[in-house]
């Protein structure tokens, strides 16, 4: 049984934001402080990613554990009321997220998901540093140059030729 009336529950649920959430702001503030520049909620990309780093061809989704059904997380507990509705809703969200990641991948974009529980104070710094490391890794991997080894017939050093010239 819900402790709130329908009207109270409606007001409570309506107040939940989808943009500029605290976890999203934490990630954005960290990225900006480390020199990463980004766009928000890009309308032309599938799923309107929370953060888009064009230079890295990477998008970041900052997901709430409850709303996106984070497996094995304390924050993801199905409500006791109307469980069928919530189970279907969260399952649809998961499927939609998976489809969006696949579409982005087929378009050549990397997608990273940061979960709300990964931004709790005890693990926040580790998560953000791992995110930074991942972005640098993506950048370097995407820009790898193929190096061709050439076989030199005679390897000589400049210093050798100078010393030989001075002897004569």
Residue ranges of each PLM-predicted region?
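Nucleic-acid endo/exonuclease domains
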Residues: 1-113, 117-168
């Amino acid at each position: 049984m819900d402790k709130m009336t329908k009207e109270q529950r409606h007001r409570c649920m309506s107040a939940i934001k989808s943009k500029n959430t605290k976890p999203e702001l934490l990630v954005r503030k960290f990225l900006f402080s480390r020199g990463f520049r980004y766009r928000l909620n890009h309308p032309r990309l599938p799923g309107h990613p929370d953060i888009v780093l064009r230079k890295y061809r990477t998008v970041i989704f900052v997901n709430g554990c409850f709303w996106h059904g984070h497996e094995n997380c304390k924050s993801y507990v199905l409500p006791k009321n109307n469980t069928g509705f919530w189970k279907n809703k969260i399952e649809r969200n998961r499927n939609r997220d998976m489809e969006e990641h696949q579409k982005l991948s087929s378009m050549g974009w990397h997608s990273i998901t940061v979960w709300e529980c990964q931004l709790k104070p005890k693990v926040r710094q580790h998560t953000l540093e791992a995110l930074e490391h991942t972005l640098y890794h993506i950048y370097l991997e995407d820009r790898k140059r193929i190096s061709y080894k050439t076989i030199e017939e005679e390897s000589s050093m400049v210093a050798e030729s100078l010393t030989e010239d001075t002897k004569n």
